[in-house]
Amino acid sequence: MKVVYGHTDSIYVQIDSVEKAQGAIEHINNEVRKKFPNVLGLEEHPVVLEFEKFYSSLGVGITKNRNAGLVSWQDGVWLDEPKFAMTGFSAKKISETKFAKGIQQEVLKMWVEQKTFDEINSHLQKKYNDALSGNVEFESLIKRRRFNIEKFMLKCPCKKQMSAFKLSNGDDLIQGLYCSKCGKPRTSFTTREGKKPTYSEGNAAIMFSIQNGLLREDIDSYVFLKVEPVGFYTHPITGKKIEGHYVARRTYDDLREYTPNYAHYAEQVLKKAKPVYDAMGWDTLKIKNKKQTLEEWF
Protein backbone atom coordinates (compact mmCIF):
# COMPACT_ATOMS: atom_id res chain seq x y z
CA MET A 1 0.00 0.00 0.00
CA LYS A 2 1.11 3.54 -0.73
CA VAL A 3 0.11 6.28 1.70
CA VAL A 4 -1.11 9.28 -0.29
CA TYR A 5 -2.49 11.47 2.49
CA GLY A 6 -2.88 11.51 6.27
CA HIS A 7 -4.48 13.83 8.80
CA THR A 8 -5.01 13.55 12.57
CA ASP A 9 -7.10 10.37 12.88
CA SER A 10 -7.40 9.38 9.22
CA ILE A 11 -5.14 8.01 6.51
CA TYR A 12 -5.64 7.55 2.77
CA VAL A 13 -3.83 4.77 0.95
CA GLN A 14 -3.70 3.59 -2.64
CA ILE A 15 -5.08 0.05 -2.90
CA ASP A 16 -6.62 -1.99 -5.71
CA SER A 17 -9.93 -3.11 -4.25
CA VAL A 18 -12.31 -3.12 -1.30
CA GLU A 19 -11.47 -6.76 -0.63
CA LYS A 20 -7.75 -6.03 -0.39
CA ALA A 21 -8.46 -3.07 1.88
CA GLN A 22 -10.60 -5.21 4.19
CA GLY A 23 -7.83 -7.81 4.35
CA ALA A 24 -5.24 -5.15 5.14
CA ILE A 25 -7.42 -3.70 7.91
CA GLU A 26 -7.85 -7.12 9.52
CA HIS A 27 -4.11 -7.80 9.34
CA ILE A 28 -3.17 -4.42 10.85
CA ASN A 29 -5.70 -4.74 13.69
CA ASN A 30 -4.41 -8.22 14.52
CA GLU A 31 -0.83 -6.96 14.64
CA VAL A 32 -1.85 -4.07 16.91
CA ARG A 33 -3.53 -6.51 19.30
CA LYS A 34 -0.40 -8.65 19.40
CA LYS A 35 1.90 -5.71 20.11
CA PHE A 36 -0.48 -3.97 22.51
CA PRO A 37 -2.69 -6.50 24.35
CA ASN A 38 -6.00 -5.38 25.82
CA VAL A 39 -4.66 -5.54 29.38
CA LEU A 40 -7.68 -3.71 30.81
CA GLY A 41 -10.05 -6.33 29.49
CA LEU A 42 -12.22 -3.84 27.62
CA GLU A 43 -15.02 -5.12 25.39
CA GLU A 44 -13.16 -3.66 22.41
CA HIS A 45 -9.47 -2.98 21.97
CA PRO A 46 -8.82 0.76 22.59
CA VAL A 47 -7.03 1.09 19.23
CA VAL A 48 -9.06 0.03 16.20
CA LEU A 49 -8.37 0.87 12.56
CA GLU A 50 -11.65 1.28 10.67
CA PHE A 51 -12.30 1.13 6.93
CA GLU A 52 -14.75 3.92 6.08
CA LYS A 53 -14.62 4.74 2.38
CA PHE A 54 -13.30 3.45 -0.90
CA TYR A 55 -12.68 6.07 -3.57
CA SER A 56 -12.81 5.10 -7.22
CA SER A 57 -10.94 8.36 -7.80
CA LEU A 58 -9.20 10.71 -5.35
CA GLY A 59 -7.45 14.03 -5.81
CA VAL A 60 -5.22 15.42 -3.06
CA GLY A 61 -4.32 19.11 -2.87
CA ILE A 62 -0.85 20.34 -1.97
CA THR A 63 -2.31 22.16 1.05
CA LYS A 64 -2.99 20.07 4.15
CA ASN A 65 -6.49 18.71 4.76
CA ARG A 66 -7.66 19.18 1.17
CA ASN A 67 -8.93 16.31 -0.91
CA ALA A 68 -11.79 15.48 -3.24
CA GLY A 69 -12.95 12.27 -4.81
CA LEU A 70 -15.68 9.90 -5.93
CA VAL A 71 -16.76 7.49 -3.17
CA SER A 72 -18.04 4.16 -4.50
CA TRP A 73 -18.13 2.19 -1.22
CA GLN A 74 -18.92 3.54 2.25
CA ASP A 75 -19.42 1.90 5.67
CA GLY A 76 -19.75 -1.58 4.21
CA VAL A 77 -22.13 -0.71 1.38
CA TRP A 78 -21.55 -0.30 -2.36
CA LEU A 79 -23.23 2.90 -3.55
CA ASP A 80 -25.61 2.84 -6.53
CA GLU A 81 -23.41 5.48 -8.15
CA PRO A 82 -20.19 7.21 -7.07
CA LYS A 83 -20.77 10.06 -4.61
CA PHE A 84 -18.71 13.23 -4.86
CA ALA A 85 -17.04 14.17 -1.56
CA MET A 86 -14.58 16.88 -0.60
CA THR A 87 -12.72 18.02 2.50
CA GLY A 88 -11.00 21.29 3.35
CA PHE A 89 -12.20 23.42 0.43
CA SER A 90 -13.93 26.81 0.74
CA ALA A 91 -16.91 25.52 -1.27
CA LYS A 92 -18.15 24.06 2.02
CA LYS A 93 -18.14 27.41 3.81
CA ILE A 94 -21.53 28.95 4.52
CA SER A 95 -20.05 32.44 4.12
CA GLU A 96 -18.95 31.84 0.51
CA THR A 97 -20.97 33.10 -2.48
CA LYS A 98 -23.08 30.68 -4.50
CA PHE A 99 -21.02 31.63 -7.55
CA ALA A 100 -17.66 30.80 -5.93
CA LYS A 101 -18.98 27.56 -4.44
CA GLY A 102 -20.28 26.46 -7.82
CA ILE A 103 -16.98 27.15 -9.55
CA GLN A 104 -14.96 25.18 -7.01
CA GLN A 105 -17.36 22.24 -6.95
CA GLU A 106 -17.36 22.08 -10.75
CA VAL A 107 -13.57 22.13 -11.10
CA LEU A 108 -13.14 19.57 -8.32
CA LYS A 109 -15.66 17.20 -9.89
CA MET A 110 -13.98 17.52 -13.29
CA TRP A 111 -10.63 16.89 -11.63
CA VAL A 112 -11.66 13.68 -9.85
CA GLU A 113 -13.44 12.53 -13.01
CA GLN A 114 -9.99 12.80 -14.60
CA LYS A 115 -10.94 15.36 -17.21
CA THR A 116 -8.02 16.70 -19.20
CA PHE A 117 -6.38 20.08 -18.68
CA ASP A 118 -7.91 21.35 -21.92
CA GLU A 119 -11.40 20.28 -20.83
CA ILE A 120 -11.11 21.87 -17.40
CA ASN A 121 -9.41 25.01 -18.64
CA SER A 122 -11.91 25.53 -21.45
CA HIS A 123 -14.80 25.23 -18.98
CA LEU A 124 -13.21 27.75 -16.62
CA GLN A 125 -12.38 30.16 -19.45
CA LYS A 126 -16.07 30.34 -20.26
CA LYS A 127 -16.96 30.92 -16.61
CA TYR A 128 -14.30 33.63 -16.36
CA ASN A 129 -15.47 35.44 -19.49
CA ASP A 130 -19.13 35.13 -18.47
CA ALA A 131 -18.35 36.73 -15.11
CA LEU A 132 -16.25 39.47 -16.68
CA SER A 133 -19.09 40.40 -19.04
CA GLY A 134 -21.74 40.25 -16.30
CA ASN A 135 -23.36 37.12 -17.68
CA VAL A 136 -23.92 35.59 -14.23
CA GLU A 137 -26.88 35.24 -11.90
CA PHE A 138 -26.96 38.42 -9.80
CA GLU A 139 -28.02 36.65 -6.58
CA SER A 140 -25.10 34.22 -6.88
CA LEU A 141 -22.63 37.07 -6.21
CA ILE A 142 -24.21 38.19 -2.94
CA LYS A 143 -23.15 37.22 0.57
CA ARG A 144 -25.43 37.21 3.61
CA ARG A 145 -24.31 37.81 7.19
CA ARG A 146 -25.72 38.20 10.66
CA PHE A 147 -25.24 41.66 12.13
CA ASN A 148 -23.75 41.82 15.61
CA ILE A 149 -23.31 45.32 16.96
CA GLU A 150 -20.88 43.96 19.56
CA LYS A 151 -18.30 43.37 16.82
CA PHE A 152 -18.25 47.11 16.17
CA MET A 153 -17.68 48.14 19.77
CA LEU A 154 -14.24 49.66 20.38
CA LYS A 155 -12.27 49.93 23.59
CA CYS A 156 -9.65 52.47 24.61
CA PRO A 157 -6.76 51.41 26.90
CA CYS A 158 -8.44 53.55 29.57
CA LYS A 159 -11.43 51.12 29.39
CA LYS A 160 -13.80 53.64 27.80
CA GLN A 161 -15.96 51.88 25.20
CA MET A 162 -17.76 53.30 22.20
CA SER A 163 -19.42 52.22 18.96
CA ALA A 164 -17.39 52.46 15.76
CA PHE A 165 -20.45 54.03 14.17
CA LYS A 166 -20.58 56.81 16.77
CA LEU A 167 -16.98 57.70 16.01
CA SER A 168 -17.90 58.62 12.48
CA ASN A 169 -21.41 59.99 12.81
CA GLY A 170 -21.28 63.19 14.81
CA ASP A 171 -20.39 61.91 18.29
CA ASP A 172 -18.15 64.25 20.26
CA LEU A 173 -15.30 61.80 19.75
CA ILE A 174 -15.27 62.63 16.06
CA GLN A 175 -13.99 66.09 16.94
CA GLY A 176 -10.48 64.65 17.23
CA LEU A 177 -8.67 61.41 16.67
CA TYR A 178 -8.28 60.92 20.41
CA CYS A 179 -10.23 59.43 23.29
CA SER A 180 -12.38 62.11 24.93
CA LYS A 181 -11.68 60.59 28.35
CA CYS A 182 -7.91 60.01 28.45
CA GLY A 183 -6.61 61.65 25.27
CA LYS A 184 -5.02 58.52 23.84
CA PRO A 185 -5.03 58.32 20.03
CA ARG A 186 -7.72 56.22 18.38
CA THR A 187 -5.02 54.09 16.82
CA SER A 188 -4.64 52.51 20.27
CA PHE A 189 -8.29 51.38 20.27
CA THR A 190 -9.06 47.67 20.02
CA THR A 191 -12.14 45.50 19.81
CA ARG A 192 -13.61 44.25 23.07
CA GLU A 193 -11.57 41.07 22.56
CA GLY A 194 -8.37 43.14 22.36
CA LYS A 195 -7.89 42.69 18.62
CA LYS A 196 -7.02 45.33 16.05
CA PRO A 197 -10.22 46.56 14.33
CA THR A 198 -10.42 45.76 10.62
CA TYR A 199 -12.96 46.94 8.07
CA SER A 200 -12.92 44.81 4.94
CA GLU A 201 -15.59 43.05 2.92
CA GLY A 202 -18.69 42.65 5.11
CA ASN A 203 -17.48 45.06 7.80
CA ALA A 204 -16.62 47.67 5.17
CA ALA A 205 -20.03 47.16 3.57
CA ILE A 206 -21.93 47.67 6.81
CA MET A 207 -19.77 50.67 7.77
CA PHE A 208 -20.40 52.34 4.41
CA SER A 209 -24.13 51.67 4.43
CA ILE A 210 -24.85 52.75 8.00
CA GLN A 211 -22.80 55.92 7.62
CA ASN A 212 -24.61 56.75 4.39
CA GLY A 213 -28.07 56.12 5.82
CA LEU A 214 -28.74 52.96 3.83
CA LEU A 215 -29.09 50.79 6.94
CA ARG A 216 -29.83 51.21 10.63
CA GLU A 217 -27.89 49.76 13.55
CA ASP A 218 -30.88 47.75 14.79
CA ILE A 219 -30.88 45.22 11.93
CA ASP A 220 -30.29 41.52 12.59
CA SER A 221 -28.83 40.55 9.21
CA TYR A 222 -27.75 42.02 5.90
CA VAL A 223 -26.62 41.11 2.40
CA PHE A 224 -23.65 42.69 0.69
CA LEU A 225 -21.92 42.92 -2.65
CA LYS A 226 -18.64 44.20 -4.06
CA VAL A 227 -19.53 47.01 -6.43
CA GLU A 228 -18.03 49.70 -8.60
CA PRO A 229 -17.12 52.70 -6.36
CA VAL A 230 -20.26 54.43 -5.10
CA GLY A 231 -19.09 56.99 -2.56
CA PHE A 232 -17.12 57.27 0.66
CA TYR A 233 -17.24 56.43 4.34
CA THR A 234 -15.12 57.60 7.27
CA HIS A 235 -12.70 55.14 8.82
CA PRO A 236 -13.57 55.19 12.56
CA ILE A 237 -9.95 54.83 13.67
CA THR A 238 -7.98 57.01 11.27
CA GLY A 239 -10.74 59.47 10.40
CA LYS A 240 -9.80 59.17 6.73
CA LYS A 241 -12.31 59.08 3.90
CA ILE A 242 -12.42 55.62 2.33
CA GLU A 243 -13.88 54.88 -1.08
CA GLY A 244 -16.77 52.45 -0.81
CA HIS A 245 -16.29 49.23 -2.75
CA TYR A 246 -18.78 47.17 -0.75
CA VAL A 247 -22.45 47.94 -0.14
CA ALA A 248 -24.79 46.31 2.38
CA ARG A 249 -28.59 46.31 2.26
CA ARG A 250 -31.45 44.34 3.80
CA THR A 251 -32.57 42.39 0.72
CA TYR A 252 -31.23 41.16 -2.61
CA ASP A 253 -33.59 43.50 -4.45
CA ASP A 254 -32.18 46.49 -2.56
CA LEU A 255 -28.78 45.73 -4.09
CA ARG A 256 -29.98 45.66 -7.69
CA GLU A 257 -29.43 49.38 -8.15
CA TYR A 258 -25.67 48.83 -7.86
CA THR A 259 -23.26 47.54 -10.49
CA PRO A 260 -21.26 44.53 -9.28
CA ASN A 261 -17.50 44.65 -9.67
CA TYR A 262 -17.51 41.92 -12.30
CA ALA A 263 -13.71 41.93 -12.63
CA HIS A 264 -13.50 40.97 -8.95
CA TYR A 265 -15.92 38.08 -9.39
CA ALA A 266 -14.15 36.90 -12.54
CA GLU A 267 -10.95 36.64 -10.49
CA GLN A 268 -12.84 34.31 -8.14
CA VAL A 269 -12.78 31.74 -10.94
CA LEU A 270 -8.98 31.68 -10.82
CA LYS A 271 -8.92 31.67 -7.03
CA LYS A 272 -11.29 28.72 -6.70
CA ALA A 273 -9.47 26.74 -9.38
CA LYS A 274 -6.05 27.37 -7.82
CA PRO A 275 -5.97 24.34 -5.44
CA VAL A 276 -6.50 21.98 -8.36
CA TYR A 277 -4.13 23.84 -10.69
CA ASP A 278 -1.43 23.93 -7.99
CA ALA A 279 -1.81 20.20 -7.35
CA MET A 280 -1.42 19.48 -11.06
CA GLY A 281 1.35 22.01 -11.73
CA TRP A 282 -0.88 24.07 -14.00
CA ASP A 283 -0.92 27.86 -14.37
CA THR A 284 -4.22 29.58 -13.51
CA LEU A 285 -3.30 32.44 -15.85
CA LYS A 286 -4.11 30.03 -18.67
CA ILE A 287 -7.76 30.53 -17.70
CA LYS A 288 -7.47 34.13 -18.85
CA ASN A 289 -5.48 33.42 -21.99
CA LYS A 290 -7.69 31.93 -24.65
CA LYS A 291 -5.73 30.31 -27.46
CA GLN A 292 -7.01 31.17 -30.90
CA THR A 293 -7.11 28.70 -33.76
CA LEU A 294 -6.04 29.62 -37.30
CA GLU A 295 -9.72 29.85 -38.27
CA GLU A 296 -10.32 32.43 -35.53
CA TRP A 297 -7.42 34.57 -36.70
CA PHE A 298 -8.73 34.93 -40.28
Locations of regions flagged by a protein language model:
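DNA-dependent DNA polymerase catalytic subunits
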Residues: 1-8, 13-298
